[in-house]
A protein has these predicted regions:
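Beta-propeller blade termini and top-face loops
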Residues: 1-257
Length: 257
């Protein structure tokens, strides 16, 4: 059914590809990826489709980013296949048994919002921001340590690719960590250097969070959690750092705080 593997999004994320050398082998994708080895023919109560990925890697399944759109099977070696999704390109050389990202050193993300910390906020202050390195889908962190001013630290909400936190190291290349999965929406950094925190949100007003950086390790508090569609998909929000108040577009004709 539509709700099974596309979860109501078949207008957006739906692909199918048959192996040109063996049409009994086929791949379908919605949110995640599935493969059949018998042409999708059910035998009794058994499911002819095997799930080969999960959008954040759970239940023993390997990670492949959500929302599948396309795939290409090699005309020379049908074991080799590329999958295109909202996270870029994923590759397998054994019919999807093992998948790996092919986006290393490519920065193709699109920012909805971005928030920058005051340049002196982390002067003489060290803190570790925990998160996930999405290039390998493993836990990672950003360590901020500076004995002088002008540390560039920012956070931003990305289309389909979470909320990324990053800090500079002079002219050296740095990598961001994802601090909130799914779609990244509003991001707001406190402009009070004596109160180090930032605000993030998922879509609508579903997961508004505050991340405290005053200690030596980041700590996250959920300010609002709901399953509704109050506000816009990428809703307008703003932070008054002086009062510690978040304002949000929450419903037609009204604003909540």
């Amino acid at each position: 059914s539509d709700d099974d593997f596309t979860r109501g999004q078949s207008f957006y994320d739906l692909m199918i590809k048959a192996d040109p050398a063996n049409p009994n082998v086929a791949y379908v994708g919605g949110i995640d990826l599935f493969r059949t080895d018998n042409g999708g023919n059910a035998s009794g109560s058994s499911n002819p489709w095997t799930q080969i990925s999960h959008w954040y890697g759970m239940s023993g399944l390997q990670f492949a980013h959500a929302d599948q759109h396309s795939s290409v099977i090699s005309s020379v070696d049908a074991n080799k296949i590329l999958f295109g999704n909202d996270g870029g390109i994923f590759y397998s050389n054994n019919q999807g048994t093992n998948l790996g990202s092919r986006n290393y050193n490519y920065h193709t993300s699109q920012y909805y919002t971005i928030a920058v910390a005051p340049s002196t906020m982390f002067e003489n202050h060290s803190v570790t921001q925990r998160g996930t390195d999405r290039s390998v889908n493993r836990s990672s962190s950003v360590f901020i340590s500076r004995t002088g001013p002008n540390q560039d630290v920012f956070v931003g909400g990305l289309q389909d690719n979470g909320t990324m936190f990053q800090a500079d190291r002079g002219n050296a290349k740095t990598r961001a960590v994802d601090v909130s999965g799914g779609d990244g929406a509003a991001s707001m950094f406190s402009q009070n250097v004596n109160n180090k925190y930032y605000i993030t949100n998922y879509v609508y007003n579903r997961a508004v969070e505050a991340v405290n950086l005053n200690g030596d390790t980041s700590r996250t508090w959920r300010l609002n959690s709901e399953g509704s569609t109050n506000g816009d998909f990428i809703t307008v929000q703003d932070l008054d750092s002086n009062r510690g108040v978040v304002y949000s577009n929450y419903r037609s004709g009204g604003t909540n705080r």
